[in-house]
Amino acid sequence: MAVQRTFSILKPDATERNITGAINALIEKAGLRIVAQKRIHMTRGQAETFYAVHKERPFFGELVDFMTSGPVVVQVLEGEGAIAKYRDVMGATDPSKAADGTIRKLHAKSIGENSVHGSDAPETAAIEIAQFFAGNEIVG
């Protein structure tokens, strides 16, 4: 399997509880390297652009409000099959359905406050990474 990069967000429910280190430990334990990372307060415009795919969904406004409610940590992860590997480490969106040992099983508060986001495909990973990082900010 090829080395890939994927995009990750540690969401406001994770930063407010100061569990970003615990989440990073799970990421690294899975064999993924954090090659870029920064803590930001996402603007409304950034959140609306990032989640534009959900614009017509009834939860869009609530999602944007949540993602701008506090700091987030945006990351670029790298490793063999990084996209699938990180999705496995995150676990199901619904923490009650997530496998034991996954980030969401261990740390998510609810379906809405599920602690993390990860890219779902190489194309979306490239777009998401470019939204938050310049090339020289990614150091592999």
Swiss-Prot record:
GO terms for molecular function: ATP binding; metal ion binding; nucleoside diphosphate kinase activity. It is found in: Cytoplasm. Pfam families: NDK. It is an enzyme of class 2 (transferase). ATP binds at residues 11, 59, 87, 93, 104, 114. GO terms for biological process: CTP biosynthetic process; GTP biosynthetic process; UTP biosynthetic process. Its EC number is 2.7.4.6. Keywords: ATP-binding, Cytoplasm, Kinase, Magnesium, Metal-binding, Nucleotide metabolism, Nucleotide-binding, Phosphoprotein, Transferase. Its cofactor is Mg(2+). Gene3D superfamilies: Nucleoside diphosphate kinase-like domain. One of its GO terms (cellular component) is cytoplasm. Its main location: cytoplasm. It catalyses: a 2'-deoxyribonucleoside 5'-diphosphate + ATP = a 2'-deoxyribonucleoside 5'-triphosphate + ADP; a ribonucleoside 5'-diphosphate + ATP = a ribonucleoside 5'-triphosphate + ADP. The active site is at 117 (pros-phosphohistidine intermediate). Belongs to the NDK family. HAMAP family: NDP_kinase. Homotetramer. Major role in the synthesis of nucleoside triphosphates other than ATP. The ATP gamma phosphate is transferred to the NDP beta phosphate via a ping-pong mechanism, using a phosphorylated active-site intermediate. NCBIfam families: PRK00668.1 (NF001908). This is Nucleoside diphosphate kinase.
